[in-house]
C-alpha cells in the first residue's frame, strides 16, 4: 500500500504542466518597447506581428518609433550563416533586464511566413524561449508557412493567429495581464 502511494506521488510529480511555455530569465523593465522597422518591404508582416502581441492580453506593448528612438530594430537582413535560419533575435541585457535588441529576417521571405517569423522573434525580444511540445508561436521551426506542431492552414488561408494563448500566457507571466486567444486562427489570403 505504501509503495502504491509512493508510485502515485512520483507519477503526479512528473505530469507535465498544462502550460508548455518557457522564458529565458530576462525581460524588459518597462511595459513599452519602442520598435523601428528598417526594411520597408517587411512592413505588413511586422504590423501583423506587433498587432498580435499587442492584443495578447499581456501588459506589454510594442510601439512603432523612428530608428533614432528605437530600443529594437527590426528587419535587419539575415543573408549569411545557417541556411535553415529564417529569423534571429539578439538582445543586450544587464542583470536580467533586456535593454535593446535586433530582429533579423532572411531576404525574400514570403509575407505570411515573415509574419510568423516576426511574431516568433518578437517573442524572443519579450524574453520567451523555444517551445516544441505543442503548437506555439515559439516553436523552433516553421513547416512551410506554419509553426512546427501546428495544423497547416486550409487552402486559401494563412495562420493569422500569430500568438497562441500559451505564448500569451508566458508574456502575461513576465509582464502581468490576462492572456487572450487570437480572434481567428486562420484568415483568407484574399483579405
Identify the meaning behind each predicted range.
Residues 4-15:
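Bacterial N-terminal signal peptides
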Amino acid at each position: 500500500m505504501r509503495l502504491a502511494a509512493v508510485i502515485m506521488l512520483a507519477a503526479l510529480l512528473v505530469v507535465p504542466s498544462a502550460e508548455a511555455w518557457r522564458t529565458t530569465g530576462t525581460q524588459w523593465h518597462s511595459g513599452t518597447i519602442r520598435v523601428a522597422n528598417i526594411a520597408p518591404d517587411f512592413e505588413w508582416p511586422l504590423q501583423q506581428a506587433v498587432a498580435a502581441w499587442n492584443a495578447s492580453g499581456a501588459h506589454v506593448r510594442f510601439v512603432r518609433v523612428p530608428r533614432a528612438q528605437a530600443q529594437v530594430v527590426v528587419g535587419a537582413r539575415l543573408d549569411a550563416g545557417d541556411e535553415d535560419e529564417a529569423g534571429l533575435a539578439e538582445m543586450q541585457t544587464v542583470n536580467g533586464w533586456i535593454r535593446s535588441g535586433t530582429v533579423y529576417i532572411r531576404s525574400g521571405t514570403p509575407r505570411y511566413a515573415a509574419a510568423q517569423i516576426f511574431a516568433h522573434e518578437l517573442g524572443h525580444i519579450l524574453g520567451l524561449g523555444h517551445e516544441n511540445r505543442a503548437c506555439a508561436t515559439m516553436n523552433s521551426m516553421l513547416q512551410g508557412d506554419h509553426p512546427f506542431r501546428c495544423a497547416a492552414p486550409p487552402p486559401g488561408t494563412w495562420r493569422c493567429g500569430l500568438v497562441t494563448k500559451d505564448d500569451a500566457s508566458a508574456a502575461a507571466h513576465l509582464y502581468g495581464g490576462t492572456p487572450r486567444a487570437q480572434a481567428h486562427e486562420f484568415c483568407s489570403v484574399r483579405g
